[in-house]
Structures are given as C-alpha cells and as structure tokens.
C-alpha cells in the first residue's frame, strides 16, 4: 500500500465503512427476528438476547483495549486464556438484563468504539501489523460472524 496521506485516509475510510456495513447487517438481522427469538436458543446455547449482550461486551472490551493503547498500558485483549469461558461469563452476566436495555448497550458500546477510533492515526489504523488494525479487524470479523448466526436462525 502506498503510504501517502491520501491513500491512508482512503484506507481508513474503507475500513470504517466496512465496520459500519457489518454492524448494519447485525441490526438488520436483529430487526428480522421474531419476539420469540429473543430468549430461544438458536446459536448453540445462545439466544438473540445472548448474542446482543455478547456483542456489547465485545465492543466494550475492544474499547478498553484501545484506551489501554492510547494510555500506554499493555493490551490483554488477544491474551484471553480461555475465550469460551470469557464469552460464557459475559453472556451469563447479561442474561438478567432487559433485551431493550441490551440493545441500548450495543448502541452505546459502538458509539464509544467510534470515539476511540477517532483518536487513532491513519497510519496506525491502516497498518496491518499494528495492534490498532488488528483490534479493528477483530470487531469487523466478529460482527460478521454473529450476524451470520442471527441470519441462519
């Protein structure tokens, strides 16, 4: 990739557009679900409520990682020893929360993520070897994985 400011800005816009497209797919697929899907397991043991809570938790974890980077602290996001256990713990924590509140958490966590991304330079966000790029890519891929699960219900 040519590292001129114009191409870096273009690549940043492309990545942020991809992020937006994947999250819009999440929302679109949530909207197509029936009320009964909120608490009915259809993705393994997970219901729509569980997936929405999980996505909000994941966004919040990535926001924390971006803050850690910005503040010079080590990032532990990629070092979670038992990802299945982490996911199960976070899903369980959200199970008692009203579904509509979880949707608001999902909106809020994405807004916080976008704020953090605004603070990242084009160079870091578009460098495929940077932690910032890897974090952004993980969110894009994560949204894609889960909207596919919702769509397949």
Question: Where in the sequence are the language-model features?
Answer:
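Short amphipathic alpha-helical segments with heptad-repeat character
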Residues: 13-16, 20, 52, 56, ...
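Short, helix-capping/interhelical loops that line the mouth of catalytic, cofactor-
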Residues: 1-14, 62-108
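Long, hydrophobic N-terminal alpha-helical segment
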Residues: 8, 12-37
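Alpha-helix C-capping/helix-to-loop hinge sites
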Residues: 36, 93-97, 120
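Short, contiguous alpha-helical
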Residues: 2-3, 36-85, 122-153
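Structural signal for well-ordered, non-membrane alpha-helices
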Residues: 23-34, 60-67, 107-121, 144-147
């Amino acid at each position: 990739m040519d590292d001129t400011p114009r191409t870096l800005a273009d690549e940043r816009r492309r990545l942020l557009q991809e992020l937006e497209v994947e999250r819009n797919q999440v929302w679109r697929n949530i909207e197509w679900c029936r009320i009964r899907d909120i608490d009915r397991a259809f993705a393994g043991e997970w219901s729509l409520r569980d997936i929405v809570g999980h996505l909000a938790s994941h966004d919040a974890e990535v926001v924390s990682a971006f803050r850690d980077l910005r503040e010079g602290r080590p990032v532990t996001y990629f070092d979670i020893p038992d990802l299945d256990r982490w996911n199960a713990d976070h899903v369980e924590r959200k199970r008692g929360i009203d579904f509509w509140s979880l949707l608001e958490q999902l909106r809020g966590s994405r807004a916080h993520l976008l704020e953090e991304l605004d603070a990242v330079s084009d160079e870091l966000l578009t460098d495929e070897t940077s932690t910032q790029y890897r974090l952004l890519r993980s969110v894009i891929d994560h949204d894609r994985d889960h909207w596919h699960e919702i769509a397949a219900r």
